[in-house]
């Protein structure tokens, strides 16, 4: 590849079930020059998120779907190499919706500057980026945990779950994570300080909840949906809060999304289940980011990035999210 060539992955069709390489069109195009108000960014790292699967679907959502023939949407960090925008200078590092490509050329809507001297660039896609903001606001605003309460998280060894669980510990809660595999569960307890971990691949989730949550569940932070959501609903306490942050077990379904059978537990326990979209809190990101950075500086918050190299691996790397292969925040090094 030369400096004048931009490799891109475009959405070729709307997938039924899992996205595959055939879901995308790969192309190489010349790199243009920024027009008035635009910047040219050399992409360095791209964030791979479960939400990307939803962005491929047509229909009403919190954000318009990626259009057929458009560059696949992805958040990322990169360096400005040409600018025709007074707000950004050559050499600036930025975080924004860069797309699955080598270079971003366009208006920097919603972009903001980051400092590689303060933290490694991939961290601005994990704890210090949208992932961290999701964990922070979903837990603290929707979950509203109180010291001494029991907080359970699914997808607990993933990007959002691992950070949200640590924040719950900082708030004085008993924290139990649900993850797939002994290594992930060991990481939650030994490295992140969780009070318990349930290996859904090798043990019965109901039994694990009974063991690790003998007093029931006050806050459930759901990233997976499906049978695990149903199991936790059966253990809710009075006035419990259920945060619907994601449902990764359902995103690739070819049939209708499976609803919870135990939803009457919400009625009996006067509990609340609420959906969450991080962009609702955009005006508060700066203050939250300062608090998150402070926790990290004190060693109270750890961030794990799972970095895969090579833009050309994008379709296969994306599938790691849905098979549970990733360990921490999945990042693609361009």
Indicate where each model-derived feature is located:
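C-terminal hydrophobic helical "lid"/dimerization subdomain
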Residues: 2-4, 279-334
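Glycine-rich beta-strand-centered segment in the early N-terminal region that forms part
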Residues: 30-48, 56-100
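NAD(P)H dinucleotide-binding glycine-rich loop of Rossmann-like/cofactor-binding domains
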Residues: 72-78, 89-155, 300
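N-terminal Rossmann-like NAD(P) cofactor-binding module of classical short-chain dehydrogenase/reductase
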Residues: 95, 152, 198, 220-221
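Short, glycine/polar-rich helix-capping loops at beta-to-alpha or helix-loop-helix junctions
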Residues: 102, 180-188, 205, 257-263
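Mid-domain Rossmann-like dinucleotide-binding core that forms the NAD(H)/NADP(H) cofactor-binding site
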Residues: 125-203
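Short amphipathic alpha-helix with an adjacent loop that forms part of the alpha/beta core around
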Residues: 204-215
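Glycine-rich phosphate-binding loop and adjacent beta-alpha segment
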Residues: 227-301, 334
């Amino acid at each position: 590849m030369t400096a004048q060539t931009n490799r891109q992955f475009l959405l070729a069709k709307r997938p039924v079930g899992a996205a595959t390489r055939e879901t995308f069109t790969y192309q190489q195009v010349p790199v243009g020059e920024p027009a008035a108000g635009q910047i040219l960014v050399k992409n360095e790292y791209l964030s791979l998120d479960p939400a990307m699967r939803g962005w491929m679907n047509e229909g009403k959502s919190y954000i318009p779907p990626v259009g057929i023939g458009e560059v696949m949407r992805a958040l990322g960090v990169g360096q400005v190499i040409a600018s025709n925008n007074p707000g950004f200078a050559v050499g600036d590092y930025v975080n924004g919706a860069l797309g699955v490509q080598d270079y971003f050329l366009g208006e920097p809507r919603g972009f903001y500057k980051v400092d590689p001297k303060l933290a490694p660039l991939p961290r601005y896609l994990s704890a210090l980026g949208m992932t961290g903001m999701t964990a922070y606001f979903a837990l603290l605003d929707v979950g509203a945990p109180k010291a001494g309460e029991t907080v359970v998280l699914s997808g607990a060894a993933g990007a959002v779950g691992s950070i949200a669980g640590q924040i719950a510990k900082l708030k004085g809660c008993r924290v139990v994570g649900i993850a797939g595999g002994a290594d992930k569960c060991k990481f939650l307890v030994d490295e992140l300080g969780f009070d318990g971990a349930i290996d859904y691949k090798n043990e019965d989730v109901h039994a694990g909840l009974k063991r690790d949550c003998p007093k029931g569940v006050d806050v459930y932070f759901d990233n997976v949906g499906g049978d695990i959501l149903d199991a936790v609903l059966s253990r809710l306490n009075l006035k419990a809060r259920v945060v619907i942050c994601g449902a990764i077990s359902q995103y690739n379904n070819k049939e209708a999304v499976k609803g919870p059978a135990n939803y009457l537990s919400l009625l009996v326990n006067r509990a609340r289940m609420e959906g969450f979209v991080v962009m609702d809190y955009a005006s508060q990101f700066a203050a939250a980011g300062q608090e998150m950075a402070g926790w990290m500086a004190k060693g109270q918050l750890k961030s794990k990035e799972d970095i895969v190299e090579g833009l050309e691996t994008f379709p296969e790397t994306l599938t790691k999210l849905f098979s549970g292969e990733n360990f921490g925040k999945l990042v693609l090094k361009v």
